[in-house]
UniProtKB/Swiss-Prot annotation:
Leader sequence segment: none
Chain's role: Catalyzes the intramolecular carbocycle formation from D-glucose-6-phosphate to 2-deoxy-scyllo-inosose (DOI).
Pfam families hit by this protein: DHQ_synthase, DHQS_C
Similarity section: Belongs to the sugar phosphate cyclases superfamily. DOI synthase family.
Domain of life: Bacteria
Protein's organism: Streptoalloteichus tenebrarius (strain ATCC 17920 / DSM 40477 / JCM 4838 / CBS 697.72 / NBRC 16177 / NCIMB 11028 / NRRL B-12390 / A12253. 1 / ISP 5477) (Streptomyces tenebrarius)
Pathway connected to this protein: Metabolic intermediate biosynthesis; 2-deoxystreptamine biosynthesis; 2-deoxystreptamine from D-glucose 6-phosphate: step 1/4; Antibiotic biosynthesis; tobramycin biosynthesis
Name of this chain's protein: 2-deoxy-scyllo-inosose synthase
CDD domains (UniProt xref): DOIS (cd08197)
Binding site for Co(2+): E184, H247, H263
Length: 386
């Protein structure tokens, strides 16, 4: 397995990446000498990989249990966390236990917060099974669940002891989840690492089918992009805020859709919205907006909003965006990550955040919902395992 050391301030952990390397994953987990391995996943991932992984751990490492949670963003809440905490304690976990987050971003967030809270902190290992998780969520210390009014509003920062990733697991993903991850790759290219753009313009495929070497390149480049902005900002409160590009409208859409819109698809159209806001504020020209539409469209997701999600539900949730409070703003403004050009976020008061008038942002949201054309697949297309 290829090993990269992830560094965020005083936090370091290894990211081990391979293909067809489940035996290596079991070996690495066994070396942690846990008193109990809690393999946390949704029911679909449990059938694909979870029960097998737990059985292998029981044979070679020690006691192991599979804990499942309901699939979907709509179940990423405190109720699910409470149920899992009770189940973990009844399974026999103690302070020497290890939580194994086996799945996508939803599982990783739930497992991360569970590990942080059990006995005030036990070890966490990410075994990501989606593109979003492999190249985005496991490269962050943020662990959070949703509140009723918005995404990721209840949480903390907690590092894994390591990440163990097998790209062969991506072979069972539905196309929706591949596209979701690729939207985060586009975000990294537009906001942080524009050297990626030409390759992506040539290689992105709306059908979501990629050779393993292309996916490995995207993961490697995304690791490098995140390192650029988090190496000295482990809490993502300064330059790391650029990773929120596209997430203001994206999170609001994802939450308003009750999980029908994937995280990446929300971020995709959220980046288009951010580019259009920046254009209307005079920071970028129409060509940059078109570049956003082109790259997001090539991923295979929509660059406009789905007709079945009421715009008032989206604009309501914009008021609960998780970037509130970083800057003193008038009540009629949102704090948004906006660009001056590719790889050049706009800064104010030392942060990559720009005050954007609510009336303007809400207008852009309404216009994206009213746009007659769609590029690529519907944002709210059916999904699968995460």
């Amino acid at each position: 397995m290829q090993t990269t050391t992830i560094t965020m301030g005083d936090v370091q952990y290894p990211y081990r990446l391979g293909t067809g390397c489940v035996d290596g994953i079991v070996t690495r987990l066994g070396e942690l000498e846990a008193s109990h391995y809690l393999v946390l996943c949704d029911a679909t991932v449990a059938e694909l990989y979870g029960h097998d992984l737990a059985a292998r751990l029981r044979r070679s490492a020690g006691p192991a249990s599979v804990l499942t949670h309901p699939a979907g963003e709509e179940h990423k809440g405190l109720g699910t966390l409470d149920t899992l905490a009770d189940a973990a304690l009844h399974a026999g976990v103690d302070r020497r236990g290890v939580v194994v987050a086996l799945g996508g971003g939803v599982t990783g967030n739930i497992a991360g917060l569970l590990a942080a809270l059990l006995f005030r902190g036990i070890r966490l290992v990410h075994v990501p099974t989606t593109v979003v998780a492999m190249l985005d969520s496991v490269l962050s210390l943020k662990q959070a669940v949703n509140a009723q009014v918005g995404k990721n509003l209840v949480g903390t920062f907690y590092p894994p002891v390591e990440v163990l990733a097998d790209t062969a697991m991506l072979g069972t993903l539905p196309v929706r989840e591949i596209r979701s991850g690729l939207c985060e790759v586009v975000k990294n290219a537009l906001a942080i690492r524009p050297s990626m753009i030409d390759f992506l313009a040539a290689e992105l495929r709306p059908d979501g089918r990629y050779a393993d070497d292309v996916l490995r390149w995207m993961i490697d480049e995304s690791v490098a992009a995140k390192a650029q902005v988090t190496e000295h900002d482990k809490y993502e409160r300064r330059e790391g805020l650029v990773l929120e590009y596209g997430h203001t409208v994206g999170h609001a859409l994802e939450h308003a859709s009750h999980g029908a819109v994937s995280h990446g698809a929300g971020v995709g159209v959220g980046m288009v919205a951010a580019a259009e806001v920046a254009r209307r504020l005079g920071h970028v020209d129409a060509d940059l907006v078109e570049l956003h539409r082109e790259l997001v469209g090539k991923v295979g997701v929509a660059t406009t909003l789905p007709a079945d999600v009421p715009t008032e539900e989206i604009t309501y949730r914009l008021g609960f965006d998780n970037k509130r409070g970083y800057q003193p703003l008038p009540a009629d403004h949102y704090a948004m990550v906006l660009l001056a050009d590719v790889g050049q976020p706009l800064y104010q008061d030392g942060l990559p955040l720009t005050p954007a008038p609510r009336a303007l942002v809400d207008e852009v949201v309404r216009e994206l919902a009213d746009a007659p054309s769609r590029i690529g697949a519907s944002v709210g297309s059916a999904g699968g395992a995460s």
